[in-house]
């Protein structure tokens, strides 16, 4: 991710292509994951300041090119339902997004777990060390 930041900010052989790709996604967040994916919601909530992408088996990466902050998380059991709560807490802790942006993003996420009958059976939460 540090190399992605360098490629975006400096003049390397592929800098123009990297900027074109990243800027296209930041201006059109649906390109990265459709209309309801968490990555699309993050890009929209940050007003195009944070590039991010979720991957298979509970992987999520993010880059803020202006602040030069980047990170990757991996949910050990591969279940993606923990990604939003983990990312929201990381963004809060490291002030990646403003309080208003975080609140707007958090409103769009559901952390309650329901069974097939629609009954509430728990909640996804995070304990950070």
Language-model regions, residue ranges each:
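Structured C-terminal helix/loop/strand segments within mature extracytoplasmic catalytic/sensor domains
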Residues: 2, 6-129
């Amino acid at each position: 991710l540090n190399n992605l930041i360098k490629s975006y900010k400096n003049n390397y052989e592929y800098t123009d292509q990297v900027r074109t790709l990243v800027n296209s996604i930041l201006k059109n967040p649906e390109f990265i994951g459709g209309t309801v994916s968490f990555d699309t919601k993050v890009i929209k909530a940050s007003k195009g300041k944070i590039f991010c992408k979720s991957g298979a088996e509970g992987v999520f990466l993010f880059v803020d090119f202006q602040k030069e902050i980047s990170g990757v998380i991996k949910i050990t059991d591969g279940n993606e339902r923990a990604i939003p709560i983990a990312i929201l807490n990381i963004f809060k802790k490291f002030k990646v997004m403003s309080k208003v942006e975080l609140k707007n993003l958090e409103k769009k996420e559901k952390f309650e777990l329901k069974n097939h009958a629609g009954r509430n059976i728990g909640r996804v939460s995070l304990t950070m060390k």
